[in-house]
């Protein structure tokens, strides 16, 4: 009996020793080492170079490292890049899938591609995540749980809300630390690790990953002073640290991988964790049980870098927004056509169109920061998607229209409203007519005359405006009749010395001889909007002192200066539309060899 008691006591002592040892380990500062090979889909190269060189380098180099180093975990984002691996490098793709099963090749970022976080609509941001997760489930049987954007030009307050509603738990980046020459200052990160609250109160965890190109040369990271200092800066005694390579893909260096492996096995004062991009976030779930986590409630915008991304390559912004709107309208119309048994819902076709343009929301593509040749591929894809959405929208609306009662006295015009609420708007339509009408009259479905305006007639086509009301996600039929009476034209702009004045029931506007708006009076509130001497004009800035990226780096000191007024040659001010629904003034200016036409 005494022997049994002695054995029991020994076991308890051994267990206590193990517990004490684990407690010491748990109390060590931690470093979550997150490998990455961030790959710009396009930037200083085009998509062909990405697929031929950088995608290949990424998959081949990391397969080598995964085979050689058992502690190595690789993180990589962008569903479209995985799709290219499957298409162009199928053998390596199958090998990679085995490491994904083992949890050593980690799917990061959740999305179809690492998108810009400011320009895309909320719908396409969510769609980007949905398309990425759909691919990951189908191909690998997994889902990602984080937003992984190491290199992106700022993050809106909507990001944590969008992420949380997509069941994601964390977000990481390093871009807000961009403070190199000539941009000196403090980091824009509110903290290195904490909770970010979105506009509706939804929250995700936020981690600052520092420089993603960090490397080491075969050292024991458990004794690394830099990592220890970073961990000790926070009350959490924890650092989340990217390492690897940036922009061109590839992999971390062998020396860096060996350093992490030595650190994992090391006995230094720092606990090294070879981590997936979301492991830190999972370790702190649920966040409510960790009051030590600081909370940030606001937006995280870049203020010194990439500050011209809203204006650079404006055509990309236009095509992207057209695709966002047309894609949504086409889907709603197609649902209606299917519900009426007029056509099968073209889900695969529509998904293909979304994928084709949405990967161009990548942070160096939609932002306008890539080389000109890259946009030849981008525009091509945007236009193909527009054509696909247009085909679905047109065929679906025609199908539904064929079921409507269009028996009217004149020419029937069917209007479709894809919005989720009733729309009252001035709509521009094109109507076939055998001869030019002097005027038109338009009637709604109740036979009530509505306001209209004939704009032009050419080659058997009349363009006109209709003051229309269309129900939500619905249709309305209008009756267009020609009339022998020409519509009464309204008064032209009133000349007041060298200035012009034009007004409606809401505003009274004055233009000077250069076409600049010198007065804009809100008649309902009796408030002048333009400050004296501060005319609203077409601005010209000629001294943008961006050091490296003048197309997409507009410095604050440039904007703060008074812009140059374009007054090189005589300005032409012409009334080009004059009717009850729309009055339009064209202002034509010239500066050097450029001609500018503005319409008000």
Report the location of each language-model feature:
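Surface-exposed loop and adjacent secondary-structure segments within mature catalytic domains
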Residues: 95-103, 123, 156-215
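Bacterial N-terminal signal peptides
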Residues: 7-15
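Positively charged n-region of N-terminal signal peptides that target proteins for export
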Residues: 1-4
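Alpha-helical scaffold elements lining the catalytic groove of polysaccharide deacetylases
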Residues: 117-135, 210-231, 553, 558-562
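CE4/NodB-like, metal-dependent polysaccharide N-deacetylase domain
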Residues: 125-153, 157, 165, 225-243
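N-terminal catalytic cores of secreted or lumenal carbohydrate-active enzymes
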Residues: 21-128, 135-139, 165-169, 176, ...
């Amino acid at each position: 009996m005494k022997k049994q008691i002695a054995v029991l006591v020994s076991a308890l002592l051994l267990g206590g020793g193990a517990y004490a040892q684990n407690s010491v380990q748990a109390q060590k500062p931690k470093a979550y080492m997150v490998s990455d090979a961030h790959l710009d889909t396009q930037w200083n190269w085009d998509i062909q170079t990405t697929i031929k060189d950088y995608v290949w380098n990424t998959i081949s180099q990391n397969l080598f490292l995964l085979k050689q180093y058992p502690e190595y975990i690789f993180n990589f984002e962008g569903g479209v890049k995985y799709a290219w691996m499957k298409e162009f490098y199928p053998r390596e793709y199958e090998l990679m899938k085995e490491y994904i099963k083992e949890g050593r090749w980690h799917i990061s970022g959740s999305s179809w591609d690492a998108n810009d976080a400011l320009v895309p609509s909320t719908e396409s941001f969510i769609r980007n995540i949905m398309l990425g997760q759909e691919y990951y489930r189908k191909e690998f049987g997994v889902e990602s749980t984080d937003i992984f954007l190491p290199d992106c030009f700022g993050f809106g307050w909507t990001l944590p809300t969008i992420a949380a509603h997509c069941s994601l738990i964390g977000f990481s980046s390093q871009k807000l630390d961009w403070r190199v020459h000539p941009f000196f200052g403090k980091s824009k990160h509110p903290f290195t690790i904490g909770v970010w609250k979105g506009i509706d109160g939804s929250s995700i965890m936020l981690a600052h990953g520092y420089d993603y190109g960090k490397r080491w040369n075969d050292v024991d990271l458990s004794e690394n002073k830099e990592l220890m200092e970073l961990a000790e800066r926070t009350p959490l005694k924890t650092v989340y640290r990217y390492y690897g390579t940036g922009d061109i893909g590839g992999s971390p260096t062998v020396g860096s991988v060996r350093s992490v492996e030595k650190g994992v096995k090391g006995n230094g004062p720092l606990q090294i964790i070879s981590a997936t991009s979301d492991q830190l976030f999972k370790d702190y779930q649920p966040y409510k049980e960790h009051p030590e986590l600081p909370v940030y409630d606001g937006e995280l915008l870049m203020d010194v870098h990439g500050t011209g991304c809203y204006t650079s390559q404006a055509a990309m912004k236009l095509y992207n927004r057209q695709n966002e709107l047309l894609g949504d309208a086409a889907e709603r119309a197609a649902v209606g056509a299917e519900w009426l048994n007029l056509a099968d819902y073209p889900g695969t076709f529509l998904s293909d169109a979304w994928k084709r343009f949405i990967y161009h929301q990548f942070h160096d593509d939609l932002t306008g920061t890539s080389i000109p040749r890259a946009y030849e591929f981008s525009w091509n894809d945007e236009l193909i998607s527009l054509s696909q959405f247009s085909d679905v929208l047109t065929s679906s609306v025609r199908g539904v229209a064929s079921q409507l009662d269009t028996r009217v006295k004149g020419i029937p015009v069917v209007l479709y409203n894809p919005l989720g609420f009733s729309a009252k708007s001035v709509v521009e339509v094109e109507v076939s007519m055998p001869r030019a009408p002097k005027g038109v009259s338009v009637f709604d479905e109740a036979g009530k005359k509505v306001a209209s305006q004939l704009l032009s007639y050419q080659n058997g086509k009349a363009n006109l405006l209709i003051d229309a009301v269309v129900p939500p996600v619905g249709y309305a039929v209008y009756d267009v009749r020609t009339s022998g009476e020409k519509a009464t034209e309204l008064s032209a702009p009133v000349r007041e010395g060298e200035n012009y004045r034009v007004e409606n029931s809401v505003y009274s506007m004055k233009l000077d001889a250069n076409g600049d708006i010198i007065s804009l009076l809100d008649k309902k509130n009796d408030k002048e909007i333009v400050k004296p001497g501060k005319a609203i004009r077409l601005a010209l800035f000629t001294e943008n002192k961006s050091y490296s990226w003048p197309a997409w780096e507009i410095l604050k000191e440039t904007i703060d200066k008074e812009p140059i007024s374009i007054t090189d040659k005589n300005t032409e001010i012409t009334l080009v539309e004059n009717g009850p629904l729309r009055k339009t003034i064209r202002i034509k200016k010239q500066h050097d060899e450029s001609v500018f036409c503005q319409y008000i």
